[in-house]
């Protein structure tokens, strides 16, 4: 298992009643490996303030398998205006060190910098970003061909599978997103050793 395997994830939506107007939406999930709970994940979509909407994701993971130890506290913050990403920040605090990623709209392009565990990336993106990995946690990615990966600073390709199932692929990393009634209930992150399962908590 590698550190980016867990950092692939962001959040997932909970089943239940629609939020009241002006209320934040919160989704809580458990993260499992080999049937064992190893962490939690919480995604929040704040109530819109004018044209602005803020999304956040917090993941807290601890894995201890024999000689394999992993600790990750991971936070994503995305700010959208009129449906376009203006600023995305990622902070990861791990037993391998502290890491960060940032994508910021400069009026005619994004400055993108990702400095994560064994992953360093710089880019300029001129196309407005309107869909990110975090957005997948608040509804099916119907009609979306790709999602901006906040952690990596580039994109996952999205494709639809049978039923309300979607596949995300980037550089050999694969995940399956499963929806029920438009709500994301499970993510299966494929891993050569053990898959990571993220499940909606009751």
Where is each model-derived feature located?
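Solvent-exposed helix/loop surface patches that form functional interfaces
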Residues: 22-24, 89-201
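N-terminal mature ectodomain segment of secretory-pathway/periplasmic proteins
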Residues: 23-27, 31-105
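Sec-dependent signal peptide recognition
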Residues: 1-8
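Hydrophobic h-region of N-terminal signal peptides that target proteins for export
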Residues: 9-16
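Amphipathic/hydrophobic helical signal segments and adjacent flexible N-terminal regions
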Residues: 3, 17-18
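Short, aromatic- and cysteine-enriched interfacial helices/patches
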Residues: 3, 66-68, 137-138, 193
